[in-house]
Amino acid sequence: MQKFEKGFFVGAATAAHQVEGNNIHSDYWAQEQLPHTSFAEPSGIACDHYNRYEEDIRLLADAGLNAYRFSIEWARIEPEEGKFDPAEIEHYRKVIACCKAHGIEPVATLLHFTSPKWLIAMGGWEAESTVEYFKRYVSYVMEQLGSELSYVCTINEANMGLQLAAISKRFRLMAEQAAKAAASAGKSAEGSVQVGMNFQKMMENMKYAAAENAAVFGTPQPKIFVSERTPEGDLLVMRAHAAAREAIKAICPEVKVGLTLSLHDLQAQPGGEAFAAAAWEEEFTHYLPYIKEDDFLGVQNYTRTLYGAQGQLPAPQGAELTQMDYEFYPQALENVIRKVAADFKGDLIVTENGIATADDTRRVAFIEAALAGVQHCIADGIPVKGYFHWSLMDNFEWQKGYAMNFGLIAVNRETMERTPKPSLATLGGYANA
């Protein structure tokens, strides 16, 4: 094992809705309660991280890690439009202070998929007003907490909506062919987006969803952040990021600002070159004009995607698959970093990389291979400044519920007892104090 240089972030990541619990004012909480929800189960108290963050941060620090990426929940800070909750600001102030007390660098994400329910009722992530609402929220958070932070991610996986639009279109086309084809297609389609989605269940529930969503959000097709996005909505997200960056720099000019992107290692088989090139343009290249002023880019990668002469291909026959049906392919991270660095000349931080598996020996192997790739990139002069493993603990994987084991720490669903896995110590061993 080769340790990273001093100052390199070796950390773990979480998202508020997936770990905190009782995020009752959010759009996701509302969707989880629908009679015909696409969620396998509701988030409930999640991992109770809201009340147990001190224990979780201590476990992270005791293992040798030196950084923690977490998200600040907009729906807690602004549960009603224009009404901010100072008690929730104080909660996150305590989280940041706890990190620093344990020698942990706090890296805050201001939007990790979930939004306040009221925002979605006002048009959500296809409405121009959302840009100003987001800027106002970001300004409030930075006025209160900005002096205590050095790194801020504005938006997590800003490209997720376009990825979902492409995958949903492909899934619907395959599902129309036959029930048998739909079953197998559902597996491969879900494996090509880096978030837990139940596409088959979503299609089955469509006839009920419109009325139920209208009753909750005032619209039959709520534009939550993780939903199919139009090109106009894609640009709106970029404007929201730019507005947030401007607000952060005006209040705390020394804070380093960036966003994160979900990036696959897109590999072309003979005849698939045009498909792979088009996918990379949509997934990454067209965002370059909007992130050129950022201090860093958050790279989030879990696997590769193959393309042939007819388009996207399934994982190779006999390939090891994770619980998410992703191909076990840790070398994807190095490939993505190198491809990104060819066009983006700022600092890079791996803000997510991980594996869903009940076999922690495979997680250890994944970490070791992925970090070897990161070290190869650094040796070649690529400015990679940190690595955050997804995730600190087993948690709520969105529509898939609690069945996915992404964590470095196991969480007993009955007692909430934490049990560090060997992979946590493995990751900590790479950090230089």
PLM regions: where:
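Active-site-adjacent substrate/metal-binding segments within catalytic domains
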Residues: 20-92
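Active-site region of glycoside hydrolase catalytic domains
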Residues: 1-37, 81-82, 89-363, 372-433
